[in-house]
Amino acid sequence: MICIPVIDKDVSDAINSAKEALKYGDIVEFRIDLLNDVNFKDIEEFSKIPSIITIRAEWEGGAWRKSNEERIELLKNAIKNNAKFIDIELKEEKNLELVKYRNEIGSTTKIIVSYHDFEKTPEIDELIDVVEKELKIGDIAKFATFAHSKEDTLKILNLMNRYSGKIIAIGMGESGKLTRILGLDFGSILTFASMGGKASAPGQVDVKKLKEILKLIN
């Protein structure tokens, strides 16, 4: 799957961007933390669209500055409305609470548990530990680390291959672009691509360019 981040600040703009993005990608990621304002009704509307609902905490590189209680309740609302995916951080103490809630109400939402390092790509043993912890909590493990070298890129591709079909792995930055291009072939369930110059992380490839490259290599 190709996932296109939606990073608008207005709810109606985000809905329109998502509809346009789905002409090129398979799914969108709604970055709820970047919106000026959001309520339960908005989450219900977002959940109708094939998407990942992400409300990234400020302490994990996001922009959510309101209470964590409100953040968790909004994510529960996404689960209640059977959003395709939600994303919750590995470091979030209430991640298991969301999984328990999903199971109790019989929601079809898949839970992505994520980890970010915006400075470096840790050693492979540390990344394995992260992925194992994430898979004990949710359905899909995700990590995004900053790649500084070919060695970092190879580490990330190695992990994709090892956990094929249950991982999303990303190398941020110029050196990590190869992870975005080859990710699907190495076992990542999706790769992120930007549209119209709107990227949510460094190194995202434009969706049209990515599709051209994927067509050439496949």
Swiss-Prot record:
Enzyme class: lyase
Top-level lineage group: Archaea
Active-site residue numbers: H116, K142
Description of the deletion phenotype: Deletion mutant is auxotrophic for all three aromatic amino acids (AroAAs) and lacks 3-dehydroquinate dehydratase activity.
Catalytic function, reaction form: 3-dehydroquinate = 3-dehydroshikimate + H2O
GO annotation, biological process: 3,4-dihydroxybenzoate biosynthetic process; amino acid biosynthetic process; aromatic amino acid family biosynthetic process; chorismate biosynthetic process
InterPro entries: 3-dehydroquinate_DH_AS (IPR018508), Aldolase_TIM (IPR013785), DHquinase_I (IPR001381), Type-I_3-dehydroquinase (IPR050146)
Statement: the UniProt record of this protein carries the keyword tRNA-binding: no
Keywords associated with the record: Amino-acid biosynthesis, Aromatic amino acid biosynthesis, Lyase, Schiff base
Pathway of action: Metabolic intermediate biosynthesis; chorismate biosynthesis; chorismate from D-erythrose 4-phosphate and phosphoenolpyruvate: step 3/7
Keyword Transport in annotation: no
Pfam families found in the cross-reference section: DHquinase_I (PF01487)
Gene Ontology molecular function: any one: 3-dehydroquinate dehydratase activity
Sites where the protein binds 3-dehydroquinate: E29, F30, R31, R56, R180, S200, Q204
Record-listed E.C. numbers: 4.2.1.10
Family according to the record: Belongs to the type-I 3-dehydroquinase family.
HAMAP family per UniProt: AroD
NCBIfam families (UniProt xref): aroD (TIGR01093)
Physiological role: Involved in the third step of the chorismate pathway, which leads to the biosynthesis of aromatic amino acids. Catalyzes the cis-dehydration of 3-dehydroquinate (DHQ) and introduces the first double bond of the aromatic ring to yield 3-dehydroshikimate.
Subunit structure: Homodimer.
Protein's UniProt name: 3-dehydroquinate dehydratase
Organism of derivation: Methanococcus maripaludis (strain DSM 14266 / JCM 13030 / NBRC 101832 / S2 / LL)
Classification lineage: Archaea, Methanobacteriati, Methanobacteriota, Methanomada group, Methanococci
